[in-house]
């Protein structure tokens, strides 16, 4: 049986050096730079067919704005935002998705939308990307959302419709291979979020020294899924400790309860006795452990 994988939208096909490298300067002709699309093709078996359509673009040209009026950089910025190496074809992308067994939607921001001196009026998926993603989901096919960019983005209206979500950030020179290996299950993901994801645009990302909000968030700091599961038990914490000690020893047991080998990031958080502290909860330590079932 032939399985068709539909790749919709173009971050992963065109000019990966700018999409994957953030604001850094790298050589676009360097053969080591590979897109996710090009990384997927040789990794798929003969029973898989990979299709591609660029359904929508990054954003409208006015999505990013320079605050100071009359800034001469505005014209250059608009030209950067209008760059598109592939023409978009919304209908063709939706048609490909409806005919596919699995849909990979590569969305998010590029360095002209998120980077040094780049500002947007909101943090939802830019331009028409959210509407495009909703139409992909409406086909009824499993949609794997890959999000690129340098900050959290609000996805409250689409997350429930996605079969899986992979936050790829700006993955760098080998990002294409790394993301492809995770998508295909060649690598078991183990990363944890270094920021919290807001549920709506009305909430701001908080730092520990701003207290702990009672508002629900989409994904908390330290969150991350795996292709396996882990179980914690036997927490061992000393009843007393000297404040002059360089460290205290805290331990627990971690068991891989899933079906495949995986890495878990064990995180230790501490809270002061006073609830009025400016830092009510802090990450104080972590350990990376590789476990077999």
Where are these regions (language model features)?
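Extended, hydrophobic alpha-helical segments in both membrane/secreted and soluble proteins
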Residues: 128-133, 143-145, 165, 179
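Hydrophobic anchor at the start of a short beta-strand
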Residues: 50, 141-144
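Short, flexible loop segments at the rims of nucleotide/cofactor-binding pockets, characterized by
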Residues: 79-85, 121-123
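Glycine/threonine-rich flexible loop motifs
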Residues: 18-19, 109-126
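An anion/phosphate-binding loop that grips the pyrophosphate of nucleotide cofactors and donors
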Residues: 100
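Beta-strand-rich interaction surfaces with strong enrichment in secreted/lumenal proteins
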Residues: 285-292
């Amino acid at each position: 049986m032939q399985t068709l994988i539909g790749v919709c939208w173009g971050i992963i096909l065109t000019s990966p050096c700018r999409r994957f490298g953030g604001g850094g300067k790298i050589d676009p002709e360097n053969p080591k730079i590979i897109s996710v699309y090009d990384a997927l093709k040789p990794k798929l078996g003969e029973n898989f067919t990979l299709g591609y359509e660029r359904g929508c673009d990054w954003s409208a040209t006015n999505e990013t704005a320079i605050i100071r009026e009359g800034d001469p950089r505005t014209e250059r910025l608009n030209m950067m935002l209008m760059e598109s190496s592939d023409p978009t074809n919304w209908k063709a992308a939706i048609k490909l998705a409806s005919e596919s067994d699995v849909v990979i939607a590569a969305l998010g921001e590029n360095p002209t939308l998120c980077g040094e001196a780049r500002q947007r009026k909101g943090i939802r998926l830019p331009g028409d990307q959210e509407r495009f993603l909703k139409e992909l989901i409406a086909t009824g096919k499993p949609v794997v959302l890959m999000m690129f960019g340098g900050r959290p983005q609000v996805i409250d209206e689409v997350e429930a419709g996605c079969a899986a979500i992979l936050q790829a950030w700006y993955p760098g020179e080998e990002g294409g291979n790394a993301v492809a290996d995770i998508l295909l299950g060649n690598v078991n993901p183990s990363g944890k979020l270094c920021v919290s994801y807001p549920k709506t645009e009305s909430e701001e990302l908080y730092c520990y020294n701003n207290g702990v909000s009672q508002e629900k968030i989409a994904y908390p700091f330290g969150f991350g899924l795996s292709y396996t599961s882990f179980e914690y038990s036997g927490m061992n914490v000393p009843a007393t400790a000297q404040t002059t000690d360089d460290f205290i020893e805290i331990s627990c047991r971690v068991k891989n309860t899933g079906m495949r080998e995986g890495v878990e990031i064990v995180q230790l958080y501490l809270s002061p006795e006073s609830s009025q502290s400016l830092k009510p909860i802090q990450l104080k330590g972590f350990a990376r452990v590789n476990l077999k079932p």
